[in-house]
Curated annotation (Swiss-Prot):
Record's protein name: Cysteine synthase
EC number: 2.5.1.47
SUPFAM superfamilies: Tryptophan synthase beta subunit-like PLP-dependent enzymes (SSF53686)
Keyword Amino-acid biosynthesis: yes
Organism: Flavobacterium sp. (strain K3-15 / DSM ID92-509)
GO biological-process terms attached to the record: cysteine biosynthetic process from serine
InterPro entries reported for this sequence: Cys_synth (IPR005856), Cys_Synth/Cystath_Beta-Synth (IPR050214), CysK (IPR005859), P-phosphate_BS (IPR001216), TrpB-like_PALP (IPR001926), TrpB-like_PALP_sf (IPR036052)
Length: 307
């Protein structure tokens, strides 16, 4: 299969059946967003936001893109900026992994670190400061950009509809910017009226559950606030996940299924176990889909804890 550039390989990710990980009566499927060229689902929104800005005349060949990011969006933006020739400055909390920073540097991006205790709010504030100081700059504002939601309505959800024409009962997915869960929930619920969409967030920062924001180790999951593009009316439930159980299922999935995915993946798998396995409230014929937005390579920083 031939493509004219790396950007054409974004999307159309595979869906794989889980066979050995759970003792379950459900037919469980996982959508592998790690198959995107930058290694995560964030490649989709990076391309969408930049092309939306181009169409609106907000970017030109001399523009600088500045974005606060927890990691994967930064990698996606770095990949797209490299192909399109834009200068990119990424702002992130210092708690984000060294692996992600090195990948961004490999694509040619510059980055600025902010205090970990300020979380993503601190990164957003710093990005806004840099934008004011930098002529001809543009901030994608992934937490507020409608293009983030739109790309998931138009691509991710359509791929799911094509793969599951018979329908789905549950979708379990995490919340970072809120674009993915909002986009697929909006599109899928139009076709699957009985679909239940379950959001996953860190137990140490359970903002959607009514708790307080706090630092946590599940990178990319839980921004510490409710993003403006997140439509909480589309959610049928919110569940939390802890670090230890998440790591446990990351390595079990690798050993039993040959699927080595990242923090989103491990959190969803552990939540599936607690939510579905042995729960008589769920029908034995239920069909759940779990999304896995990143590669397991991003876990290697903590490999001593999971291997």
């Amino acid at each position: 299969m031939k493509f004219q550039n790396a950007l054409e390989t974004i999307g159309n990710t595979p869906v794989v059946k889980i066979n050995n990980l759970f003792n379950s009566d459900h037919e469980i499927w996982i959508k592998l967003e790690k198959s995107n060229p930058g290694g995560s689902i964030k490649d989709r929104i990076a391309l969408a936001m930049i092309e939306d800005a181009e169409a609106k005349g907000l970017l030109n060949k001399d523009s600088t893109i500045i974005e606060p990011t927890s990691g994967n969006t930064g990698i996606g933006l770095a990949l797209v900026a490299a192909v399109k020739g834009y200068k990119l400055i990424l702002v992130m909390p210092e708690s984000m992994s060294i692996e992600r920073r090195k990948i961004m540097e490999a694509y040619g991006a510059e980055f600025v670190l902010t205090p970990r205790e300020k979380g993503m709010k601190g990164a957003i504030e710093k990005a806004n400061e840099l934008a004011e100081e930098t002529p001809n700059s543009w901030i994608p504002r992934q937490f507020d950009n409608p293009a983030n939601v739109k790309i998931h309505v138009e691509t991710t959800a359509q791929e799911i509809l094509q793969d599951f024409p018979e329908g789905l009962d549950y979708v379990i997915t995490g919340v970072g910017t809120g674009g993915h869960i909002t986009g697929i929930a909006k599109a899928l619920k139009e076709k699957y009226p009985n679909l239940k969409v379950i959001a996953v967030e860190p137990e140490l920062s359970p903002v959607l559950s009514g708790g307080s924001p706090a630092p946590h180790p599940l990178q990319g999951l839980g921004a510490g606030f409710v993003p403006s593009i997140l439509d909480i009316t589309l959610l049928d439930g919110v569940i939390t996940v802890g670090k230890d159980e998440a790591y446990e299922y990351a390595i079990n999935a690798a050993k039993k299924e040959g699927l080595f995915c990242g923090s989103f993946h491990r959190s969803r798998l552990s939540r599936y176990r607690k939510t579905f396995t042995g729960n008589t409230a769920w029908s034995k014929n239920s069909l759940p889909l779990i999304t896995t937005p990143e590669k397991g390579i991003f876990l290697l920083r903590d490999s001593s804890k999971i291997l």
